[in-house]
C-alpha cells in the first residue's frame, strides 16, 4: 500500500513522495499539544534522515534504528496523551481504526524504504486526527489540519485505507462529497 501515491506521480522526481512527513512545518506543529508537537518534530527528523539514507543508497533496507525511534516516539506520545486527564477518554472510531491498522502492519521492521515511509505517514495521520478540528487561538473549530491535503485527496491515505474521503478536518460534522 503506497500511502503517499505511487512513484512517478509526484512533481520533483520519481521519489519526491517518499518520506513526505519530512515536509512538516512549525506552523502545523503549532496546532498541536505538547505531546503531539514532540512526536511531529521527531517524525520529521526521522523522515528527513531516512530520505537522505535512501538518496545515498536506494537499494539498501532502511536502518532498523529509524523505525525503532519512530515507534518509541509514537509510544511516548500515546502514553502522554493517555496520562493527560484534561483530554476526553474516548477515542473517535476513525482514530481507533488507524491505530488498529498501525498495530497490525507495524510489528516487524520495515523491509523497504517505501514500507517505512508508509508507516510514518500512517503515524502522522493518526496524530493529525487528534488535533484537526479542535479550536486553537484565533482559529474556528472547523479549521482543517493544514496538512489535510496529504490525507484527503484522490489516492491519499483516506482513499487508500478506507476507500472514502474521511479526511482529518472537522470533528463532528461529516464532510459531504458530490458524486459524479
UniProtKB/Swiss-Prot annotation:
Q: Which UniProt keywords apply?
A: Host nucleus, Late protein, Virion, Virion tegument
Entry's Gene Ontology molecular function annotations: zinc ion binding
Q: What is its main location?
A: virion
- Subcellular location(s) per record: Virion tegument; Host nucleus matrix
Q: Does the keyword Plastid apply?
A: no
Q: What induces it?
A: Expressed late in the infection cycle.
Against InterPro entries, the record matches this protein to: EHV_Unk (IPR000714)
The known PTMs are summarized as:
Phosphorylated.
Q: Which GO terms describe its cellular component?
A: host cell nuclear matrix; viral tegument
Belongs to which family?
A: Belongs to the herpesviridae US10 family.
The name this protein carries in UniProt is Virion protein US10 homolog
Q: Which organism is it from?
A: Varicella-zoster virus (strain Dumas)
Amino acid at each position: 500500500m503506497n500511502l503517499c501515491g505511487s512513484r512517478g506521480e509526484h512533481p520533483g522526481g520519481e521519489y519526491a513522495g517518499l518520506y513526505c512527513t519530512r515536509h512538516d512545518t512549525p506552523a502545523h506543529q503549532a496546532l498541536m499539544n505538547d505531546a503531539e508537537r514532540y512526536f511531529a518534530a521527531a517524525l520529521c527528523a526521522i523522515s528527513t534522515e531516512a530520505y537522505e539514507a535512501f538518496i545515498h543508497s536506494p537499494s539498501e533496507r532502511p536502518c532498523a534504528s529509524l523505525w525503532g525511534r519512530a515507534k518509541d516516539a509514537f509510544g511516548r506520545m500515546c502514553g502522554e496523551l493517555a496520562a493527560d486527564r484534561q483530554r476526553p477518554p474516548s477515542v473517535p472510531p476513525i482514530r481507533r481504526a488507524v491505530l488498529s491498522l498501525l498495530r497490525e502492519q507495524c510489528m516487524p521492521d520495515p523491509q523497504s524504504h517505501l514500507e517505512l515511509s508508509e508507516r510514518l505517514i500512517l503515524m502522522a495521520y493518526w496524530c493529525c486526527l487528534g488535533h484537526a478540528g479542535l479550536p486553537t487561538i484565533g482559529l474556528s473549530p472547523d479549521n482543517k489540519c493544514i496538512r489535510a491535503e496529504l490525507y484527503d485527496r484522490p489516492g491519499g491515505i483516506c482513499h487508500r485505507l478506507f476507500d472514502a474521503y474521511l479526511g482529518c478536518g472537522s470533528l463532528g460534522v461529516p464532510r459531504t462529497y458530490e458524486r459524479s
